[in-house]
């Protein structure tokens, strides 16, 4: 049974010449220039090159490495092209690339005839495209589909890898799926690159005399794509926010092992809207559809992965505790899914990584029964993974990544013992250098997944890298926490709109009046309020220091203290209106 399409008749073009003419863009594969196509710069229409031959000299010629698709805004079409790439390794023997730069090229003239409001809206949409051009963690391959895990691809019918790449891919993990419609309609199969958002990390281990390659491929689902505070919980279809499938692949002595784990936000209807406070209150939405939402979510998981064990790592007190309790209540209605509550902070604190052994005592037997996927050098299937662990904390980032790396380590130990590389007394931690490499790729995977959802690197990364917290790591976590606060409150509204646009949740159309929600008072009022607050604190401190001189100083000090308190109260009362909020779509 084939694992990689090395003998496939189908292969994507991997390098292109982009010619820019006044009236069109022309894209030609360098290896087959006669197979190119053109995009009309006036209306965005795409035609095979032989139907619209080039004439005259281009105004600019450049090299690109892929076409990501097209998107239509008010003024017309924009063409996404990959302008820079980096080879990051091999997935089952075939090269993988990371997007390091991409650009949306405008193909429109309709803006000349637009109303003032449409021009204003188009300016905002262009801002969203600019934000998307710097999207982190985008991967692709010209020779194999990255969206399918090893077990799934090995069980597909013979010849599946001869189909066009976009037909092989699982749409839920294709970041640019919404952009591919025009290219698919024009049957430009050799140009259509399914782009995956997630992470790919790889390490080469020595392991006595048995060299091994360990890689982690994480795949972000696009069905509830979003940012940390603006996409929580699930939608009515049961799609969870920050849902990521992570696959740990071990290649050793001709064997290939695969372990799947998934993460995703607690699949209830809940929200946590930013309001300038450090930790906004959680709100559980009481909705008659909630039981069905949970059922839909886990039914889908069971269909795809088999037995599911839901591991809830949230706190058992405060807002998190209330959410966890509501989750547990709904899970009682699903007898076929095992639910395990484990208060990570209470048991492990911030430093005791080894205390995850307490969790393993609860779930280890079932985890080992779920097993892993294994094929030998002749591609015979020796083992199948019968189920997965679904982990979550509040963000499904920091605590979740520590836990998933721990489970990955446990599985690796079992795999090495399975083929005799280690005996029953040995494990990956026996080999110090290899153990460091293994933990590093899990930590870097956690950082990349966190960057996509929260905008910063993961917290608790030291627990994954070193098994303990270090002073440097504590400082890094503090800086990341402050960055998250700033991004969540003042940047993520725009970023959420960009993600809603790229995922197709919001489709641009000509509407009168504009369907964009008003921006609110943040741009004009927040700087003034901030200046008053800083000024008030400064003057109050100074007048208090001078207050012993006379009564007027006391009165001045009291006045400025009152002004400062008033500004603080005003900001607190209007916190939600002073943050960056999405303008395109509702929360659910």
Swiss-Prot record:
Pfam families: Syja_N
PROSITE patterns named in the record: SAC
Keyword Calcium: no
Chief subcellular location: endoplasmic reticulum
Chain ranges passing through the membrane: 524-544, 555-575
Motif Phosphatase catalytic core, residue range(s) on this chain: 390-401
Record membrane topology: Multi-pass membrane protein
Subcellular location: Endoplasmic reticulum membrane
Xref: InterPro entries: SAC_dom (IPR002013)
Alphabetized UniProt keyword annotations: Endoplasmic reticulum, Hydrolase, Membrane, Transmembrane, Transmembrane helix
Domains: entry comment: The phosphatase catalytic core motif (or RXNCXDCLDRTN motif) from the SAC domain is found in metal-independent protein phosphatases and inositol polyphosphate phosphatases.
Name this polypeptide is given: Phosphoinositide phosphatase SAC8
Source species: Arabidopsis thaliana (Mouse-ear cress)
Taxonomy of the source species: Eukaryota, Viridiplantae, Streptophyta, Embryophyta, Tracheophyta
